[in-house]
Amino acid sequence: MIVTGATDLETAAPALSETARAKVNLTLRVVGRRADGFHDLESVVAFADCVDRLTLTQGAELSLVAAGPRAQECGQTADNLVLTAARLLGERIPDLKAGAFALDKYLPVAAGIGGGSADAAAALRLLARANGLSIDDPRLIETARLTGADVPVCVRSESCVMTGVGESLLPLDVPAMPAVLVNPRVPVATKDVFAALGLRKGQLNVGVNDLIEAIVWPEAGAPVDDWLAMLSDGANDLEAPAIRVQPVIGEVLARLRSTGARLSRMSGSGATCFAIFDDEAAAHHAAQTIRLDRPQWWVHVGTLGGGS
């Protein structure tokens, strides 16, 4: 049950706000496809400094309005993961206090950077604050998992190794790295990319010895070069099938790799790709070059990793 409909404005709680940071898969291994059809993954995840913003006005009827440059890409409001997460949490917590959500949408949709999952995670953090819950509350964790595979990692918005179908998170101290994110403004459906990968139910994709979970990652405070050396040994197993689904992803990667980046790769199931640079000046120069060549593309220059 979700409690709504407070009418006493003098006792109404103030609006609460959260940012929803873009999730970037620095590596992504598809371990295999389970008998239930889901894919087991292992991924090094970091978060970027580009965000959506979500506000909760407590006491109002549960609802969602979207604004901002990407609002029209969100689709039907009733299907939005923000409301899905709120309803699922309400099923698990009697008398959950919710309200009206307002989303300022800046991140591209169906882009491989977990925009919808980050929004849902921000909604759960807002509801936790409004109801005095810890983000470690088992009911909130269960809700995050049921809402979507990327939602648990987005609730914390901290660098980690994510395994399984998103349920296992191992924190990592990934340093802040100058980066450019590029999306060609072409949505890519995750199901289409996994279909192009073509694993059968029960089929493994990599051997146990290849799993990144067993890797000893650099310790806290290790230089960026140590991280880039290890990340460069990784890959995104969905990159090739995603390029078959949307060939423009190959062009995005080629342009990023032509800018002198230390590491370039696709995030998630695409189409967003990222590149990491030696310094901010190199990142800004690369972003400006790509914007001039492809003004219709979404380009963000900023930071990957580091603190929240």
UniProtKB/Swiss-Prot annotation:
EC id: 2.7.1.148
Cited InterPro entries: GHMP_kinase_C_dom (IPR013750), GHMP_kinase_C_sf (IPR036554), GHMP_kinase_N_dom (IPR006204), IspE (IPR004424), Ribosomal_Su5_D2-typ_SF (IPR020568), Ribsml_uS5_D2-typ_fold_subgr (IPR014721)
GO molecular function, one term: ATP binding
Pfam families listed in its UniProt record: GHMP_kinases_C (PF08544), GHMP_kinases_N (PF00288)
Catalytic activity of the protein: 4-CDP-2-C-methyl-D-erythritol + ATP = 4-CDP-2-C-methyl-D-erythritol 2-phosphate + ADP + H(+)
Keyword Transferase: yes
Keywords from the UniProt entry: ATP-binding, Isoprene biosynthesis, Kinase, Nucleotide-binding, Transferase
Functional pathway: Isoprenoid biosynthesis; isopentenyl diphosphate biosynthesis via DXP pathway; isopentenyl diphosphate from 1-deoxy-D-xylulose 5-phosphate: step 3/6
Residues bound to ATP: 108-118
Location of the active site: 23, 150
Coiled-coil boundaries: none
GO biological process: isopentenyl diphosphate biosynthetic process, methylerythritol 4-phosphate pathway; terpenoid biosynthetic process
Enzyme class: transferase
General function of this protein: Catalyzes the phosphorylation of the position 2 hydroxy group of 4-diphosphocytidyl-2C-methyl-D-erythritol.
Annotated PANTHER family: 4-DIPHOSPHOCYTIDYL-2-C-METHYL-D-ERYTHRITOL KINASE, CHLOROPLASTIC (PTHR43527:SF2)
Family recorded in the similarity comment: Belongs to the GHMP kinase family. IspE subfamily.
Name this polypeptide is given: 4-diphosphocytidyl-2-C-methyl-D-erythritol kinase
The encoding gene: ispE
